[in-house]
Amino acid sequence: MKLRGLIDEDFLNYKKPSMFLIFPYCTLKCDIENKMNVCQNSSLLKEPIIEINDVTLACRYFSNNITSSIVCGGLEPLDSFDDLLNFINLIRNEFRCNDDIVIYTGYTENEIKKELTELEKYVNIIVKFGRFIPNNDQHFDEILGCNLSSDNQYSKKIS
């Protein structure tokens, strides 16, 4: 899997201690729609892309007694959908682990219907939807247990 980084123990992006995977690509849809640079994660574009074996990454997660969920964010996980799906399949079917997997996406539900159909095949998948909109109010998301940056953003347990 290609990533821009990972955080072994993250306590900011989900209510449970998580391993945070920083996915490497994004179409910069927030910038395009706002006709200016608004991306909160644009600094990640300067980070080198690293390649890590899925099994190695999974074993790293399972060896940590603190974390109990995996959060996929960074730039845009759904712009690396094959890698994301392969990793989820490994966690669910090879390792037989049903810990929560949270996916932060800037896409709307309507834009990713096909991908959601694939993700719904796995248990305990939570998706945060919606692009960042500057000058919007933050709000607390009950499912994630943390604040989201724009009032159009929300999460949903899809399976």
What are these model-derived regions, one by one?
Residues 1-11:
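N-terminal amphipathic/basic leader segments beginning at the initiator methionine
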Residues 22, 73, 102-106, 130:
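A cross-family glycoside hydrolase active-site/sugar-binding cleft signature
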Residues 11-52:
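Canonical Radical SAM [4Fe-4S] cluster-binding loop centered on the CxxxCxxC motif
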Residues 113, 119, 125-159:
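Classical nucleotidyltransferase
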